Amino acid sequence: MVDARDGNALDRAVGDLDGVVAVPGDVSDPDHRRRLIEAAAGWIDLLVNNASVLGPSPQPVLADYPLEELRRVYEINVVAPLALVQLALPRLADGARVVNVTSDAAVEAYETWGGYGSSKAALAQITAVLGAENAGLRFYALDPGDMRTQMQQEAFPGEDISDRPPPEESVPGLLALIEGNLASGLYRARELVEATA
């Protein structure tokens, strides 16, 4: 089961994949989150929280950050992933994995990245605490690294980001968490890829 805000893009992404249920919607909507968990039949083996929002573009310094926009960033980047985990916990199979996608901005103090970065730091801490509280499950915070995405372009308006790697280069790192037996914790996709090469 997969979701995205853009139903058309979601349908294109799912394509002809067998057994994949597309549930379009916004993870900041509690009703949509409930529909997502209900659409997952039986036990849940994997939950990947990848939905994210950058915030204003260009990103302002924290002294000028619009607080309503910061609340929106936290609602999508922090509250929604935790809410999905809360709904999924009773149905997570023993040994199930939860991957929360974070960022290097969660651990590095980049100028103007305070809103997004602090939300990803909060998500990483929530992931660590969930791992400590649920010994039979694996909770991973995954930093995919810089990628050539729309969000990256929004973060650097007017700049050429063609030198960033495409998102698919981070996939082996994600697969290492999903298929491996690593302890709960914070991981960087590039390091996981290098370790498995």
Model-predicted regions and their roles:
Residues 1-12:
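Conserved glycine-rich Rossmann-like NAD(P)H-binding loop of the short-chain dehydrogenase/reductase
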Residues 6-8, 23-35, 67:
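The beta1-alpha1 cofactor-binding region of Rossmann-like NAD(H)/NADP(H)-dependent oxidoreductases
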Residues 50-58:
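Conserved NAD(P)H cofactor-binding loop of Rossmann-fold oxidoreductase domains
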Residues 58-62, 66-71:
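Substrate-binding pocket helix/loop in short-chain dehydrogenase/reductase
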Residues 85, 119:
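Active-site helix of classical SDR
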Residues 103:
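Residue(s) in the substrate-gating loop at a strand-loop-helix junction
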Residues 137, 141-144, 149, 157-197:
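C-terminal helical subdomain
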